[in-house]
From Swiss-Prot:
The Q motif is unique to and characteristic of the DEAD box family of RNA helicases and controls ATP binding and hydrolysis. A zinc finger (HIT-type) spans 104-133. A motif (DEAD box) lies at residues 353-356. The gene is DDX59. This is Probable ATP-dependent RNA helicase DDX59. Pfam families: DEAD (PF00270), Helicase_C (PF00271), zf-HIT (PF04438). Interacts (via HIT-type zinc finger) with the RUVBL1/RUVBL2 complex in the presence of ADP. Belongs to the DEAD box helicase family. DDX59 subfamily. It comes from Homo sapiens (Human). Its EC number is 3.6.4.13. The modification Phosphoserine is found at residues 64, 76, 156, 160. The keyword Manganese does not apply.
Length: 619
Protein backbone atom coordinates (compact mmCIF):
# COMPACT_ATOMS: atom_id res chain seq x y z
CA UNK A 1 0.00 0.00 0.00
CA UNK A 2 1.03 3.62 -0.09
CA UNK A 3 0.31 6.87 1.69
CA UNK A 4 -1.97 9.28 -0.21
CA UNK A 5 -1.03 12.97 -0.41
CA UNK A 6 -4.60 14.30 -0.32
CA UNK A 7 -7.11 11.47 -0.03
CA UNK A 8 -10.76 12.22 0.63
CA UNK A 9 -13.47 9.82 1.84
CA UNK A 10 -17.20 10.10 1.24
CA UNK A 11 -19.39 9.05 4.15
CA UNK A 12 -23.14 8.62 3.70
CA UNK A 13 -25.78 7.66 6.23
CA UNK A 14 -26.19 4.26 4.57
CA UNK A 15 -22.47 3.52 4.47
CA UNK A 16 -20.58 1.51 7.04
CA UNK A 17 -17.87 4.13 7.25
CA UNK A 18 -15.44 2.03 5.23
CA UNK A 19 -16.38 2.52 1.60
CA UNK A 20 -14.84 4.83 -1.00
CA UNK A 21 -16.68 6.36 -3.95
CA UNK A 22 -14.66 7.10 -7.08
CA UNK A 23 -14.98 10.35 -8.95
CA UNK A 24 -15.77 9.57 -12.59
CA UNK A 25 -13.20 11.20 -14.87
CA UNK A 26 -13.47 10.99 -18.61
CA UNK A 27 -10.02 10.16 -19.99
CA UNK A 28 -8.51 12.08 -22.88
CA UNK A 29 -8.39 10.26 -26.25
CA UNK A 30 -4.59 10.64 -26.13
CA UNK A 31 -4.49 8.86 -22.79
CA UNK A 32 -6.63 6.00 -24.11
CA UNK A 33 -4.29 5.62 -27.07
CA UNK A 34 -1.23 5.64 -24.80
CA UNK A 35 -2.80 3.11 -22.45
CA UNK A 36 -3.05 0.50 -25.19
CA UNK A 37 0.70 0.07 -25.01
CA UNK A 38 0.74 -0.38 -21.23
CA UNK A 39 1.26 -3.87 -19.92
CA UNK A 40 0.47 -4.10 -16.23
CA UNK A 41 -0.92 -7.22 -14.55
CA UNK A 42 -4.55 -6.47 -13.71
CA UNK A 43 -4.38 -8.66 -10.65
CA UNK A 44 -1.53 -6.52 -9.30
CA UNK A 45 -3.69 -3.40 -9.49
CA UNK A 46 -6.69 -5.22 -8.06
CA UNK A 47 -4.62 -6.57 -5.18
CA UNK A 48 -3.29 -3.09 -4.51
CA UNK A 49 -6.82 -1.64 -4.52
CA UNK A 50 -7.98 -4.25 -2.03
CA UNK A 51 -5.02 -3.47 0.17
CA UNK A 52 -5.86 0.23 0.07
CA UNK A 53 -9.47 -0.53 1.06
CA UNK A 54 -8.26 -2.52 4.04
CA UNK A 55 -5.88 0.30 4.92
CA UNK A 56 -8.69 2.87 4.77
CA UNK A 57 -10.90 0.75 7.02
CA UNK A 58 -8.29 1.06 9.74
CA UNK A 59 -7.05 4.25 11.36
CA UNK A 60 -5.30 6.15 8.56
CA UNK A 61 -3.89 9.69 8.51
CA UNK A 62 -5.34 12.26 6.16
CA UNK A 63 -4.63 15.95 5.82
CA UNK A 64 -7.13 18.27 7.39
CA UNK A 65 -7.97 21.58 5.68
CA UNK A 66 -5.51 23.38 7.95
CA UNK A 67 -2.68 21.13 6.84
CA UNK A 68 -2.60 19.04 10.04
CA UNK A 69 -2.94 15.28 10.03
CA UNK A 70 -6.33 14.03 11.15
CA UNK A 71 -7.06 10.47 12.20
CA UNK A 72 -9.95 8.84 10.30
CA UNK A 73 -11.74 6.09 12.23
CA UNK A 74 -14.79 3.99 11.57
CA UNK A 75 -17.90 5.94 12.50
CA UNK A 76 -21.47 5.05 13.28
CA UNK A 77 -24.20 5.68 10.70
CA UNK A 78 -25.56 8.48 12.89
CA UNK A 79 -22.19 10.21 13.04
CA UNK A 80 -21.63 9.56 9.36
CA UNK A 81 -24.86 11.34 8.52
CA UNK A 82 -23.67 14.40 10.41
CA UNK A 83 -20.30 14.41 8.67
CA UNK A 84 -21.46 13.60 5.15
CA UNK A 85 -19.95 15.72 2.40
CA UNK A 86 -20.46 16.07 -1.34
CA UNK A 87 -18.96 13.33 -3.49
CA UNK A 88 -15.17 13.19 -3.08
CA UNK A 89 -12.64 11.01 -4.85
CA UNK A 90 -10.76 7.90 -3.61
CA UNK A 91 -7.32 6.61 -4.54
CA UNK A 92 -6.95 6.64 -8.32
CA UNK A 93 -6.60 3.19 -9.88
CA UNK A 94 -5.23 4.14 -13.30
CA UNK A 95 -2.74 6.79 -14.38
CA UNK A 96 -5.01 8.02 -17.18
CA UNK A 97 -7.38 9.45 -14.55
CA UNK A 98 -4.61 11.47 -12.90
CA UNK A 99 -3.84 15.05 -13.95
CA UNK A 100 -0.44 16.26 -15.09
CA UNK A 101 1.85 17.82 -12.48
CA UNK A 102 2.21 21.57 -12.17
CA UNK A 103 5.68 23.14 -11.71
CA UNK A 104 7.09 22.37 -8.27
CA UNK A 105 4.64 19.50 -7.60
CA UNK A 106 5.89 15.91 -7.11
CA UNK A 107 6.03 13.83 -10.29
CA UNK A 108 5.16 10.15 -10.70
CA UNK A 109 8.37 8.14 -11.21
CA UNK A 110 6.64 5.97 -13.82
CA UNK A 111 4.53 8.19 -16.09
CA UNK A 112 5.38 11.78 -15.11
CA UNK A 113 1.87 12.76 -13.99
CA UNK A 114 1.08 14.37 -10.61
CA UNK A 115 2.65 12.19 -7.88
CA UNK A 116 -0.35 12.40 -5.54
CA UNK A 117 0.73 9.40 -3.44
CA UNK A 118 3.93 8.07 -1.87
CA UNK A 119 4.79 4.38 -2.19
CA UNK A 120 5.41 3.17 1.36
CA UNK A 121 7.90 0.52 0.22
CA UNK A 122 10.23 2.82 -1.73
CA UNK A 123 9.27 6.38 -0.65
CA UNK A 124 8.90 7.30 -4.33
CA UNK A 125 6.11 9.48 -5.75
CA UNK A 126 3.41 7.70 -7.80
CA UNK A 127 0.13 8.83 -9.34
CA UNK A 128 -2.07 5.73 -9.06
CA UNK A 129 -2.33 2.05 -8.14
CA UNK A 130 -1.39 1.16 -11.71
CA UNK A 131 1.88 3.10 -11.58
CA UNK A 132 2.64 1.79 -8.10
CA UNK A 133 2.37 -1.77 -9.40
CA UNK A 134 4.58 -0.88 -12.36
CA UNK A 135 7.09 0.83 -10.09
CA UNK A 136 7.35 -2.17 -7.73
CA UNK A 137 7.82 -4.51 -10.70
CA UNK A 138 10.61 -2.27 -12.02
CA UNK A 139 12.30 -2.23 -8.61
CA UNK A 140 12.04 -6.01 -8.33
CA UNK A 141 13.47 -6.55 -11.83
CA UNK A 142 16.32 -4.15 -11.08
CA UNK A 143 17.17 -6.00 -7.86
CA UNK A 144 17.13 -9.37 -9.64
CA UNK A 145 19.40 -8.08 -12.41
CA UNK A 146 21.78 -6.67 -9.82
CA UNK A 147 21.95 -10.01 -8.00
CA UNK A 148 22.56 -11.91 -11.25
CA UNK A 149 25.30 -9.54 -12.40
CA UNK A 150 27.16 -9.59 -9.07
CA UNK A 151 25.87 -12.34 -6.75
CA UNK A 152 28.80 -12.12 -4.30
CA UNK A 153 28.33 -8.39 -3.80
CA UNK A 154 24.58 -8.84 -3.35
CA UNK A 155 25.11 -11.46 -0.65
CA UNK A 156 27.81 -9.51 1.18
CA UNK A 157 26.14 -6.09 1.19
CA UNK A 158 24.23 -5.29 4.38
CA UNK A 159 20.68 -3.96 4.08
CA UNK A 160 21.70 -0.62 5.61
CA UNK A 161 25.22 0.42 4.57
CA UNK A 162 25.21 3.42 6.92
CA UNK A 163 26.73 3.51 10.36
CA UNK A 164 24.63 4.59 13.32
CA UNK A 165 26.33 7.99 13.36
CA UNK A 166 28.93 10.09 11.58
CA UNK A 167 31.79 12.10 13.03
CA UNK A 168 34.17 13.93 10.73
CA UNK A 169 37.84 13.13 11.27
CA UNK A 170 40.74 14.50 9.28
CA UNK A 171 41.97 12.02 6.69
CA UNK A 172 45.45 10.53 7.33
CA UNK A 173 46.70 12.13 4.10
CA UNK A 174 45.64 15.59 5.36
CA UNK A 175 47.06 14.93 8.84
CA UNK A 176 50.47 14.03 7.39
CA UNK A 177 50.84 17.35 5.57
CA UNK A 178 53.14 19.92 7.17
CA UNK A 179 51.67 23.19 8.42
CA UNK A 180 53.63 25.21 5.86
CA UNK A 181 52.24 22.97 3.10
CA UNK A 182 48.69 23.69 4.27
CA UNK A 183 49.35 27.44 4.40
CA UNK A 184 50.92 27.35 0.94
CA UNK A 185 47.88 25.45 -0.37
CA UNK A 186 45.51 28.07 1.04
CA UNK A 187 47.61 30.88 -0.39
CA UNK A 188 47.77 29.31 -3.85
CA UNK A 189 44.00 28.71 -3.90
CA UNK A 190 43.11 32.10 -2.41
CA UNK A 191 41.47 30.66 0.72
CA UNK A 192 41.27 33.09 3.64
CA UNK A 193 40.15 31.62 6.98
CA UNK A 194 39.44 33.38 10.28
CA UNK A 195 38.42 31.61 13.47
CA UNK A 196 39.59 29.48 16.36
CA UNK A 197 40.92 25.96 15.82
CA UNK A 198 39.86 25.70 12.18
CA UNK A 199 40.19 22.25 10.63
CA UNK A 200 42.41 21.80 7.57
CA UNK A 201 40.96 21.87 4.04
CA UNK A 202 40.35 18.64 2.14
CA UNK A 203 41.83 17.99 -1.30
CA UNK A 204 39.45 15.22 -2.41
CA UNK A 205 35.83 14.41 -1.53
CA UNK A 206 36.96 10.98 -0.33
CA UNK A 207 38.88 12.68 2.49
CA UNK A 208 35.48 13.26 4.17
CA UNK A 209 34.76 9.51 4.54
CA UNK A 210 31.22 10.01 3.25
CA UNK A 211 28.86 7.06 2.59
CA UNK A 212 29.65 5.28 -0.67
CA UNK A 213 26.22 6.17 -2.07
CA UNK A 214 26.92 9.87 -1.53
CA UNK A 215 30.37 9.63 -3.13
CA UNK A 216 28.76 7.94 -6.14
CA UNK A 217 26.11 10.68 -6.38
CA UNK A 218 28.81 13.37 -6.26
CA UNK A 219 30.63 11.84 -9.23
CA UNK A 220 27.36 11.28 -11.08
CA UNK A 221 26.47 14.96 -10.60
CA UNK A 222 29.82 16.08 -12.01
CA UNK A 223 31.68 16.84 -8.76
CA UNK A 224 35.08 15.30 -9.46
CA UNK A 225 37.40 17.61 -7.50
CA UNK A 226 36.31 20.09 -4.80
CA UNK A 227 36.57 23.81 -5.56
CA UNK A 228 38.48 26.06 -3.11
CA UNK A 229 35.34 27.06 -1.17
CA UNK A 230 34.30 23.39 -0.96
CA UNK A 231 37.76 22.32 0.23
CA UNK A 232 37.52 24.47 3.35
CA UNK A 233 33.79 24.85 3.94
CA UNK A 234 32.80 21.16 3.78
CA UNK A 235 35.08 19.89 6.60
CA UNK A 236 34.25 22.91 8.80
CA UNK A 237 30.54 22.32 8.18
CA UNK A 238 30.83 18.59 8.88
CA UNK A 239 32.32 19.44 12.29
CA UNK A 240 29.17 21.42 13.15
CA UNK A 241 30.79 24.88 13.28
CA UNK A 242 28.87 28.08 12.48
CA UNK A 243 30.12 29.56 9.19
CA UNK A 244 30.13 32.89 7.38
CA UNK A 245 31.21 32.10 3.82
CA UNK A 246 31.89 34.31 0.82
CA UNK A 247 33.16 33.20 -2.58
CA UNK A 248 33.03 34.13 -6.25
CA UNK A 249 29.69 33.53 -7.94
CA UNK A 250 29.67 30.09 -9.53
CA UNK A 251 32.36 28.73 -7.20
CA UNK A 252 30.31 25.79 -5.88
CA UNK A 253 28.92 27.26 -2.64
CA UNK A 254 25.68 25.24 -2.94
CA UNK A 255 27.39 21.85 -2.77
CA UNK A 256 29.66 23.23 -0.03
CA UNK A 257 26.69 23.63 2.32
CA UNK A 258 24.56 20.75 0.97
CA UNK A 259 27.03 18.06 2.07
CA UNK A 260 27.03 19.16 5.75
CA UNK A 261 23.23 19.49 5.57
CA UNK A 262 22.81 15.98 4.15
CA UNK A 263 25.18 14.34 6.63
CA UNK A 264 23.57 16.12 9.58
CA UNK A 265 20.02 15.23 8.51
CA UNK A 266 20.90 11.65 7.57
CA UNK A 267 21.57 10.55 11.13
CA UNK A 268 18.87 12.60 12.87
CA UNK A 269 15.66 10.85 13.89
CA UNK A 270 13.52 13.99 14.28
CA UNK A 271 11.94 15.54 11.21
CA UNK A 272 12.51 18.06 9.81
CA UNK A 273 16.15 18.30 10.85
CA UNK A 274 17.57 20.78 8.31
CA UNK A 275 16.41 24.13 6.90
CA UNK A 276 17.69 26.05 3.88
CA UNK A 277 16.40 29.61 3.33
CA UNK A 278 16.73 31.32 -0.06
CA UNK A 279 15.48 34.72 -1.31
CA UNK A 280 13.83 33.51 -4.54
CA UNK A 281 11.66 30.65 -5.79
CA UNK A 282 13.98 29.87 -8.70
CA UNK A 283 16.98 29.48 -6.42
CA UNK A 284 14.98 27.29 -4.01
CA UNK A 285 13.86 25.02 -6.87
CA UNK A 286 17.46 24.73 -8.09
CA UNK A 287 18.79 23.88 -4.63
CA UNK A 288 16.12 21.21 -4.11
CA UNK A 289 17.01 19.64 -7.46
CA UNK A 290 20.70 19.49 -6.49
CA UNK A 291 19.81 18.14 -3.04
CA UNK A 292 17.71 15.34 -4.55
CA UNK A 293 20.55 14.40 -6.89
CA UNK A 294 22.97 14.08 -3.97
CA UNK A 295 20.45 12.32 -1.67
CA UNK A 296 19.44 9.69 -4.22
CA UNK A 297 19.62 6.22 -2.66
CA UNK A 298 20.07 7.46 0.91
CA UNK A 299 17.42 6.05 3.29
CA UNK A 300 14.57 8.22 4.60
CA UNK A 301 15.93 11.39 2.98
CA UNK A 302 13.03 13.52 1.74
CA UNK A 303 12.84 17.21 0.89
CA UNK A 304 9.99 19.71 0.79
CA UNK A 305 9.87 22.91 -1.24
CA UNK A 306 8.01 25.74 0.52
CA UNK A 307 7.81 28.73 -1.83
CA UNK A 308 5.23 31.28 -2.89
CA UNK A 309 3.66 31.12 -6.33
CA UNK A 310 2.95 27.38 -6.01
CA UNK A 311 -0.14 25.72 -4.45
CA UNK A 312 -0.01 25.63 -0.64
CA UNK A 313 -2.00 22.41 0.15
CA UNK A 314 0.48 20.00 -1.51
CA UNK A 315 3.32 21.73 0.35
CA UNK A 316 1.47 21.40 3.67
CA UNK A 317 0.79 17.73 3.08
CA UNK A 318 4.34 17.03 1.98
CA UNK A 319 5.48 18.50 5.30
CA UNK A 320 3.67 15.69 7.11
CA UNK A 321 5.57 12.93 5.25
CA UNK A 322 8.58 12.91 7.60
CA UNK A 323 10.70 15.17 5.40
CA UNK A 324 14.27 15.71 6.55
CA UNK A 325 15.18 18.92 4.68
CA UNK A 326 13.06 22.05 4.21
CA UNK A 327 14.03 24.38 1.35
CA UNK A 328 12.00 27.58 1.61
CA UNK A 329 11.61 31.26 0.93
CA UNK A 330 11.11 33.30 4.12
CA UNK A 331 7.61 34.61 3.36
CA UNK A 332 6.00 31.23 2.65
CA UNK A 333 7.71 29.49 5.58
CA UNK A 334 6.69 32.23 8.01
CA UNK A 335 3.06 31.93 6.87
CA UNK A 336 3.17 28.16 7.51
CA UNK A 337 4.76 28.68 10.93
CA UNK A 338 1.97 31.11 11.86
CA UNK A 339 -0.58 28.43 10.90
CA UNK A 340 1.20 26.04 13.31
CA UNK A 341 1.60 23.63 10.38
CA UNK A 342 5.29 22.93 10.98
CA UNK A 343 7.49 22.37 14.02
CA UNK A 344 11.14 23.41 13.75
CA UNK A 345 12.23 22.24 17.21
CA UNK A 346 14.12 19.30 15.68
CA UNK A 347 16.16 21.38 13.22
CA UNK A 348 19.90 20.88 13.76
CA UNK A 349 21.34 22.90 10.87
CA UNK A 350 20.18 26.11 9.14
CA UNK A 351 21.57 27.64 5.95
CA UNK A 352 20.77 31.20 4.85
CA UNK A 353 21.81 31.34 1.18
CA UNK A 354 22.37 34.63 -0.68
CA UNK A 355 22.19 36.39 2.67
CA UNK A 356 22.97 39.83 1.23
CA UNK A 357 20.06 39.52 -1.19
CA UNK A 358 17.80 38.56 1.71
CA UNK A 359 18.60 41.86 3.39
CA UNK A 360 18.25 43.94 0.22
CA UNK A 361 14.82 42.41 -0.45
CA UNK A 362 13.72 43.31 3.08
CA UNK A 363 13.67 39.76 4.47
CA UNK A 364 15.91 40.38 7.50
CA UNK A 365 13.09 40.53 10.05
CA UNK A 366 11.37 37.51 8.49
CA UNK A 367 14.60 35.51 8.72
CA UNK A 368 15.05 36.54 12.36
CA UNK A 369 11.42 35.61 13.13
CA UNK A 370 11.94 32.17 11.58
CA UNK A 371 15.17 31.56 13.48
CA UNK A 372 13.39 32.30 16.77
CA UNK A 373 11.64 28.95 16.25
CA UNK A 374 14.97 27.12 15.89
CA UNK A 375 16.81 25.59 18.89
CA UNK A 376 19.66 27.73 20.25
CA UNK A 377 22.24 24.97 19.73
CA UNK A 378 21.46 24.74 16.00
CA UNK A 379 24.37 25.02 13.55
CA UNK A 380 23.98 28.15 11.37
CA UNK A 381 25.64 28.85 8.01
CA UNK A 382 25.44 32.22 6.22
CA UNK A 383 26.46 32.12 2.56
CA UNK A 384 26.81 34.96 0.07
CA UNK A 385 28.82 36.19 -2.88
CA UNK A 386 29.44 39.50 -1.10
CA UNK A 387 29.80 40.52 2.56
CA UNK A 388 28.63 44.10 3.10
CA UNK A 389 28.50 45.68 6.56
CA UNK A 390 24.88 44.61 7.02
CA UNK A 391 25.88 40.95 6.68
CA UNK A 392 28.69 41.40 9.20
CA UNK A 393 26.11 42.77 11.66
CA UNK A 394 23.68 39.91 10.97
CA UNK A 395 26.47 37.37 11.45
CA UNK A 396 27.32 38.86 14.84
CA UNK A 397 23.68 38.33 15.86
CA UNK A 398 23.22 34.78 14.58
CA UNK A 399 26.60 33.03 14.68
CA UNK A 400 28.42 31.63 17.70
CA UNK A 401 32.22 31.35 17.50
CA UNK A 402 32.02 31.23 13.70
CA UNK A 403 34.60 30.36 11.08
CA UNK A 404 34.86 32.97 8.34
CA UNK A 405 35.80 31.53 4.97
CA UNK A 406 36.53 33.79 2.00
CA UNK A 407 37.82 32.62 -1.38
CA UNK A 408 38.73 35.28 -3.91
CA UNK A 409 38.66 38.93 -2.89
CA UNK A 410 35.55 40.14 -1.08
CA UNK A 411 32.96 41.78 -3.33
CA UNK A 412 35.10 41.49 -6.48
CA UNK A 413 33.90 39.91 -9.74
CA UNK A 414 34.89 36.34 -10.58
CA UNK A 415 38.40 36.06 -12.03
CA UNK A 416 37.16 33.73 -14.80
CA UNK A 417 35.04 36.50 -16.33
CA UNK A 418 36.55 38.73 -19.02
CA UNK A 419 35.00 42.15 -18.41
CA UNK A 420 34.46 44.69 -21.18
CA UNK A 421 33.22 48.20 -20.31
CA UNK A 422 31.80 50.20 -23.25
CA UNK A 423 30.67 53.83 -23.23
CA UNK A 424 27.33 53.79 -25.06
CA UNK A 425 24.74 56.57 -25.01
CA UNK A 426 21.12 55.43 -24.56
CA UNK A 427 19.98 56.01 -28.20
CA UNK A 428 22.86 53.86 -29.50
CA UNK A 429 22.43 50.90 -27.10
CA UNK A 430 20.24 48.75 -29.37
CA UNK A 431 22.56 49.21 -32.35
CA UNK A 432 25.58 48.26 -30.22
CA UNK A 433 23.78 45.16 -28.90
CA UNK A 434 22.92 44.06 -32.44
CA UNK A 435 26.60 44.49 -33.42
CA UNK A 436 27.66 42.24 -30.54
CA UNK A 437 25.08 39.60 -31.48
CA UNK A 438 26.38 39.65 -35.08
CA UNK A 439 30.04 39.40 -33.99
CA UNK A 440 31.16 35.79 -34.46
CA UNK A 441 33.98 36.19 -31.92
CA UNK A 442 31.74 37.52 -29.16
CA UNK A 443 28.39 35.83 -29.85
CA UNK A 444 28.20 32.51 -28.02
CA UNK A 445 24.58 31.49 -27.46
CA UNK A 446 22.71 31.52 -25.23
CA UNK A 447 23.34 35.20 -24.43
CA UNK A 448 21.89 36.74 -21.26
CA UNK A 449 20.99 40.45 -21.54
CA UNK A 450 20.16 42.40 -18.36
CA UNK A 451 17.90 45.47 -18.39
CA UNK A 452 16.49 47.56 -15.55
CA UNK A 453 12.72 47.34 -16.21
CA UNK A 454 10.10 44.76 -17.20
CA UNK A 455 8.70 46.70 -20.16
CA UNK A 456 12.22 47.25 -21.46
CA UNK A 457 12.83 43.49 -21.32
CA UNK A 458 9.74 42.72 -23.42
CA UNK A 459 10.43 45.44 -26.01
CA UNK A 460 14.14 44.63 -26.36
CA UNK A 461 13.43 40.91 -26.75
CA UNK A 462 10.98 41.64 -29.58
CA UNK A 463 13.50 43.96 -31.26
CA UNK A 464 16.30 41.37 -31.06
CA UNK A 465 14.16 38.70 -32.70
CA UNK A 466 12.90 41.09 -35.39
CA UNK A 467 16.25 42.64 -36.34
CA UNK A 468 18.70 39.75 -35.88
CA UNK A 469 16.40 36.77 -36.46
CA UNK A 470 17.71 35.12 -33.29
CA UNK A 471 15.26 33.22 -31.10
CA UNK A 472 14.76 35.59 -28.17
CA UNK A 473 12.53 35.69 -25.09
CA UNK A 474 12.11 37.95 -22.05
CA UNK A 475 11.82 36.97 -18.39
CA UNK A 476 10.84 39.09 -15.39
CA UNK A 477 8.79 38.98 -12.18
CA UNK A 478 5.44 39.65 -13.90
CA UNK A 479 5.68 36.39 -15.84
CA UNK A 480 3.89 33.47 -14.18
CA UNK A 481 5.85 30.84 -12.29
CA UNK A 482 5.11 28.27 -15.02
CA UNK A 483 6.35 30.65 -17.75
CA UNK A 484 9.54 31.43 -15.83
CA UNK A 485 10.23 27.76 -15.16
CA UNK A 486 9.75 26.87 -18.84
CA UNK A 487 12.01 29.74 -19.93
CA UNK A 488 14.73 28.62 -17.51
CA UNK A 489 14.41 25.06 -18.80
CA UNK A 490 14.60 26.30 -22.39
CA UNK A 491 17.65 28.41 -21.58
CA UNK A 492 19.48 25.43 -20.09
CA UNK A 493 18.47 23.15 -22.99
CA UNK A 494 19.48 25.62 -25.70
CA UNK A 495 15.99 26.48 -26.97
CA UNK A 496 16.73 30.23 -26.86
CA UNK A 497 19.67 32.13 -28.32
CA UNK A 498 19.01 35.36 -26.39
CA UNK A 499 17.24 35.84 -23.04
CA UNK A 500 16.48 39.41 -21.96
CA UNK A 501 16.01 39.60 -18.20
CA UNK A 502 15.54 41.94 -15.29
CA UNK A 503 17.39 41.15 -12.05
CA UNK A 504 15.29 37.98 -11.55
CA UNK A 505 18.14 35.90 -13.05
CA UNK A 506 20.90 37.92 -11.42
CA UNK A 507 21.33 35.88 -8.25
CA UNK A 508 22.51 32.39 -7.44
CA UNK A 509 21.19 30.40 -10.40
CA UNK A 510 23.65 28.01 -12.05
CA UNK A 511 23.35 28.85 -15.76
CA UNK A 512 26.24 26.65 -16.87
CA UNK A 513 25.45 27.07 -20.58
CA UNK A 514 25.76 30.89 -20.57
CA UNK A 515 29.08 32.20 -21.93
CA UNK A 516 28.16 35.84 -22.62
CA UNK A 517 26.33 38.39 -20.45
CA UNK A 518 25.46 41.90 -21.65
CA UNK A 519 24.51 44.53 -19.08
CA UNK A 520 22.36 46.63 -21.41
CA UNK A 521 21.59 48.85 -18.40
CA UNK A 522 24.31 49.28 -15.78
CA UNK A 523 23.05 47.85 -12.43
CA UNK A 524 22.26 50.28 -9.62
CA UNK A 525 25.06 48.99 -7.37
CA UNK A 526 28.41 47.23 -7.69
CA UNK A 527 27.11 44.28 -5.69
CA UNK A 528 24.40 43.75 -8.33
CA UNK A 529 27.05 44.15 -11.03
CA UNK A 530 29.13 41.39 -9.42
CA UNK A 531 26.14 39.05 -9.32
CA UNK A 532 24.94 39.75 -12.84
CA UNK A 533 28.28 39.20 -14.52
CA UNK A 534 28.61 36.14 -12.28
CA UNK A 535 26.05 34.31 -14.45
CA UNK A 536 29.06 33.45 -16.60
CA UNK A 537 32.22 31.86 -15.25
CA UNK A 538 30.24 29.26 -13.29
CA UNK A 539 32.26 26.48 -11.62
CA UNK A 540 35.53 27.54 -13.23
CA UNK A 541 34.20 28.02 -16.78
CA UNK A 542 35.43 31.08 -18.69
CA UNK A 543 33.02 33.73 -19.93
CA UNK A 544 32.63 37.33 -21.10
CA UNK A 545 30.60 40.17 -19.58
CA UNK A 546 29.98 43.35 -21.58
CA UNK A 547 28.57 46.40 -19.79
CA UNK A 548 27.17 49.58 -21.36
CA UNK A 549 27.74 52.73 -19.30
CA UNK A 550 27.11 56.45 -19.72
CA UNK A 551 26.43 59.43 -17.46
CA UNK A 552 23.28 57.74 -16.14
CA UNK A 553 25.67 55.63 -14.03
CA UNK A 554 27.85 58.57 -12.97
CA UNK A 555 27.53 57.90 -9.23
CA UNK A 556 29.28 54.53 -9.73
CA UNK A 557 32.18 55.75 -11.90
CA UNK A 558 34.85 55.60 -9.18
CA UNK A 559 33.58 52.20 -7.94
CA UNK A 560 33.72 50.83 -11.50
CA UNK A 561 37.26 52.09 -11.98
CA UNK A 562 38.46 50.72 -8.62
CA UNK A 563 37.03 47.25 -9.08
CA UNK A 564 37.29 46.63 -12.80
CA UNK A 565 40.63 48.22 -13.71
CA UNK A 566 42.73 45.87 -11.48
CA UNK A 567 41.42 42.90 -13.48
CA UNK A 568 43.20 44.20 -16.59
CA UNK A 569 40.11 45.51 -18.35
CA UNK A 570 40.59 48.65 -20.45
CA UNK A 571 38.23 51.41 -19.35
CA UNK A 572 36.76 53.89 -21.89
CA UNK A 573 38.37 57.38 -21.95
CA UNK A 574 34.96 59.02 -21.33
CA UNK A 575 34.94 57.28 -17.95
CA UNK A 576 38.57 57.93 -17.04
CA UNK A 577 38.31 61.62 -17.97
CA UNK A 578 34.93 62.20 -16.38
CA UNK A 579 34.77 65.03 -13.80
CA UNK A 580 32.35 62.86 -11.80
CA UNK A 581 35.02 60.17 -11.40
CA UNK A 582 37.68 62.67 -10.28
CA UNK A 583 35.26 64.33 -7.86
CA UNK A 584 34.36 60.96 -6.30
CA UNK A 585 38.03 60.00 -6.10
CA UNK A 586 38.91 63.30 -4.38
CA UNK A 587 36.09 62.92 -1.84
CA UNK A 588 37.17 59.39 -0.99
CA UNK A 589 40.79 60.45 -0.54
CA UNK A 590 39.68 63.26 1.79
CA UNK A 591 37.56 60.82 3.76
CA UNK A 592 40.48 58.39 4.07
CA UNK A 593 42.77 61.22 5.16
CA UNK A 594 40.26 62.35 7.79
CA UNK A 595 39.99 58.78 9.07
CA UNK A 596 43.77 58.56 9.36
CA UNK A 597 43.88 61.91 11.21
CA UNK A 598 41.32 60.66 13.71
CA UNK A 599 43.53 57.70 14.62
CA UNK A 600 45.70 58.35 17.69
CA UNK A 601 49.30 57.29 17.04
CA UNK A 602 52.67 58.19 18.49
CA UNK A 603 53.33 60.46 15.51
CA UNK A 604 50.21 62.62 15.82
CA UNK A 605 49.48 62.44 19.55
CA UNK A 606 50.83 65.93 20.34
CA UNK A 607 48.99 67.48 17.36
CA UNK A 608 45.68 66.05 18.59
CA UNK A 609 46.33 67.40 22.13
CA UNK A 610 47.16 70.90 20.79
CA UNK A 611 44.04 70.84 18.56
CA UNK A 612 41.90 69.82 21.53
CA UNK A 613 43.38 72.58 23.76
CA UNK A 614 42.87 75.18 21.04
CA UNK A 615 39.20 74.27 20.57
CA UNK A 616 38.62 74.46 24.35
CA UNK A 617 40.28 77.89 24.64
CA UNK A 618 38.06 79.26 21.85
CA UNK A 619 34.99 78.22 23.83
Amino acid sequence: MFVPRSLKIKRNANDDGKSCVAKIIKPDPEDLQLDKSRDVPVDAVATEAATIDRHISESCPFPSPGGQLAEVHSVSPEQGAKDSHPSEEPVKSFSKTQRWAEPGEPICVVCGRYGEYICDKTDEDVCSLECKAKHLLQVKEKEEKSKLSNPQKADSEPESPLNASYVYKEHPFILNLQEDQIENLKQQLGILVQGQEVTRPIIDFEHCSLPEVLNHNLKKSGYEVPTPIQMQMIPVGLLGRDILASADTGSGKTAAFLLPVIMRALFESKTPSALILTPTRELAIQIERQAKELMSGLPRMKTVLLVGGLPLPPQLYRLQQHVKVIIATPGRLLDIIKQSSVELCGVKIVVVDEADTMLKMGFQQQVLDILENIPNDCQTILVSATIPTSIEQLASQLLHNPVRIITGEKNLPCANVRQIILWVEDPAKKKKLFEILNDKKLFKPPVLVFVDCKLGADLLSEAVQKITGLKSISIHSEKSQIERKNILKGLLEGDYEVVVSTGVLGRGLDLISVRLVVNFDMPSSMDEYVHQIGRVGRLGQNGTAITFINNNSKRLFWDIAKRVKPTGSILPPQLLNSPYLHDQKRKEQQKDKQTQNDLVTGANLMDIIRKHDKSNSQK
